[in-house]
From Swiss-Prot:
Binds 16S rRNA, required for the assembly of 30S particles and may also be responsible for determining the conformation of the 16S rRNA at the A site. It comes from Bacillus licheniformis (strain ATCC 14580 / DSM 13 / JCM 2505 / CCUG 7422 / NBRC 12200 / NCIMB 9375 / NCTC 10341 / NRRL NRS-1264 / Gibson 46). This is Small ribosomal subunit protein uS14C. One of its GO terms (molecular function) is zinc ion binding. Transmembrane segments: none annotated. Its cofactor is Zn(2+).
Length: 61
């Protein structure tokens, strides 16, 4: 879980656009965030397996 201060700091308007970065909406993780779902890979995988993300299923071929 990310520190609350870091989550609040990230949500503020940045002086320069380059400083903006994505964070997971669920846990606050800054790395490996899937932009379309606003979730990190760990949360995405967890929710996909549980069937909470519509239209997403495990691939098999």
């Amino acid at each position: 879980m990310a520190k609350t201060s870091m989550i609040v700091k990230q949500k503020r308007e940045q002086k320069f656009k380059v400083r903006e970065y994505t964070r997971c909406e669920r846990c606050g993780r800054p790395h490996s965030v899937i932009r379309k779902f606003k979730l990190c890979r760990i949360c995405f995988r967890e929710l996909a397996y549980k069937g909470h993300i519509p239209g997403v299923k495990k691939a098999s071929w």
